[in-house]
Amino acid sequence: TVAAFVAASLGLGLCADCTNLRAENGKIIATRPVNSGRDYADIISRTSPLLATVLCYSDTDGVIVSAGRGCDKQTATKLADKINAALCCSRAAVDEGKFPYACQVGLTGKAVAPDVYIALGISGAVQHVCGMENSGTVIAVNPDKSERIFDCADYGVTEKAENLL
């Protein structure tokens, strides 16, 4: 990438895919996913300045309906249309061909920060959660109550999304 080329050319460190940057004791601390997205780590650069790529919030719609592997496109679209919400999805839904990449939320997609985020059939992989973690209220709908999406949800419904409409 361009950022990696610039960092290498200048002999500087690069922290990619950051979800947060903050200053402490005169140092910049970058937070990013690690361990295949299962955890987060704070990175303190040994070089100055620090180069970083950061997930920017590209969607701040009032309400977003987001579909994962466990929800069909028709159900998600119907709900989004009914409540006048933006429609997004997880990487799994893109990989299955249900949605275009432009709809993908997460580390390899876009970051969103709506007032309300409705996750339909989304497991809650850290790669997805880091793209929606700054949402106001999170409502998770998934028949498997052990899915990680419930860990970051304000409200949870253990049911198939199709059964709610």
What are these regions (language model features)?
Residues 1-165:
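N-terminal glycine-rich FAD/FM-binding segment characteristic of electron-transfer flavoproteins
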